[in-house]
Amino acid sequence: MTDLTNQKDAALAAIAAATSLDALEEQRVAALGKKGWVSLALKTLGGMDPEERQKAAPAIQAVRAEVADAIAARKDALEREALEAQLATETLDLTLPAPQQRFGSVHPVSQVMDELAEIFADLGFAVATGPEIEDDWHNFTALNMAETHPARAMHDTFYFPDVDSEGRRMLLRTHTSPVQIRAMKAQGAPIRIIAPGRVYRSDSDATHTPMFHQVEGLVIDRDIHLGHLKWTLETFLKAFFEREDIVLRLRPSYFPFTEPSVEVDVGYSREGGRRVVGGDGNAEGHDWMELLGSGMVNRRVIEMAGLDPDEWQGFAWGLGVDRLAMLKYGMDDLRAFFDGDQRWLDHYGFSPFDQPTLSAGVGARS
């Protein structure tokens, strides 16, 4: 055992003197490797008688543990010293300019959505949302659209083969009007909301896509009349297009969910081959352009939402967000909105730092 003690003392001294991980590894192999002196000492236990083995085994195991602990402690110290040396050489110069990164851009639809929300928030409207997969009761029946209404046809609406727990057919919503029904049933009256979002119809050409964006507005209160509707739309369009010469023309129309119903035209002129909203459509060089549909909410729709139409009245309107973006920012093909062409996005996208505010003007700055 005297030889084992001497070997241990020599090994501990060599371990403490190791100045690198490689040198430390050599000491580990010399002591604890398959042919190391500790391993060889352990192998001698097999040739000892039981009494001798009972005394020698704990002593050898104690030496083995002491050497292993010394190696582990020295390894931690060497790794810590190496890390400190590395950190001392790797300094960060905070005066250096940051590397230039390419910023993404805000899609025109997202930009216009933000502009709409900013304007209507100033008018006291809240933003309401709802599911894009709807049942036919919320999408059609509750909006006074009969079973025979053309909009329910398969060639206009994307239906799912499934039905809900009440047997209602499921579909991709064709407008955001179901949000109005859900909001009235959940919140009651009075209510003042806009409902922006994606809608789906089976149509595709330069001005129509199977999926597009729509915003609808709803006001339910006492003593509401058509004059309130016209003022709201005029105020909104003046703020959105940032022009005071917005002139509207209301034409009688028909929508099953409003009565009376009106189509809203806006005066415009052509400048550089594009339509520019503003001015009287009857003036020289101007014309009228249909912009949106609106009207006073039908009594049956108010009843469907669980409200008393003798106490509560209201108006609603709906228009395409994509079309608004095209008119304001000069795009000419709706399909390009969804192509994902990076060149188009680079040209028409907006800075993420350009947040629309009424104080600075909601339009994106070039």
UniProtKB/Swiss-Prot annotation:
The protein's required cofactors: Mg(2+)
PROSITE patterns found in the cross-reference section: AA_TRNA_LIGASE_II (PS50862)
GO biological process: phenylalanyl-tRNA aminoacylation
GO cellular component labels: cytoplasm
Protein name as catalogued: Phenylalanine--tRNA ligase alpha subunit
EC number, as in UniProt: 6.1.1.20
Organism, as annotated: Erythrobacter litoralis (strain HTCC2594)
Top-level taxonomic group: Bacteria
Coiled coil (residue ranges): none
InterPro entries from the UniProt entry: aa-tRNA-synth_II, aa-tRNA-synth_II/BPL/LPL, Phe-tRNA-synth_IIc_asu, Phe-tRNA_ligase_II_N, Phe_tRNA_ligase_alpha1_bac, Phenylalanyl-tRNA_Synthase, tRNA-bd_arm
Binding positions (Mg(2+)): 259
Magnesium among keywords: yes
PANTHER family: PHENYLALANINE--TRNA LIGASE, MITOCHONDRIAL, PHENYLALANYL-TRNA SYNTHETASE
UniProt entry tagged with the keyword Aminoacyl-tRNA synthetase: yes
Family as reported in the entry's similarity comment: Belongs to the class-II aminoacyl-tRNA synthetase family. Phe-tRNA synthetase alpha subunit type 1 subfamily.
UniProt keyword list: Aminoacyl-tRNA synthetase, ATP-binding, Cytoplasm, Ligase, Magnesium, Metal-binding, Nucleotide-binding, Protein biosynthesis
Segment forming the signal sequence: none
Quaternary assembly: Tetramer of two alpha and two beta subunits.
